[in-house]
């Protein structure tokens, strides 16, 4: 039983090596300044639509205070 489990584990590791999994070190660093720019009301037209109470189609489904426009 144990040898079958070992063979199965070996085959799985050969077909899907652990190096194929993304690691946190491979991801770009989170830049707080870029996030602030993304939500700037002057650059994002969604804020103006939200003031009117109307959002474009894909966003109006997930946002409770918006009507679809």
Swiss-Prot record:
GO molecular function, one term: ion channel inhibitor activity
Tissue: Expressed by the venom duct.
Keyword Signal belongs to the record: yes
GO cellular component, one term: extracellular region
Superkingdom field: Eukaryota
Residues cleaved off as propeptide: 21-52
Subcellular location: Secreted
Keyword Ribonucleoprotein among record annotations: no
Cleaved signal peptide residues: 1-20
Keywords on record: Cleavage on pair of basic residues, Disulfide bond, Secreted, Signal, Toxin
Disulphide bridges: 54-68, 55-66, 60-69
Record family assignment: Belongs to the conotoxin M superfamily.
Free-text comment about domains: The cysteine framework is III (CC-C-C-CC). Classified in the M-1 branch, since 1 residue stands between the fourth and the fifth cysteine residues.
Record-given protein name: Conotoxin reg3.6
Organism phylogeny: Eukaryota, Metazoa, Spiralia, Lophotrochozoa, Mollusca
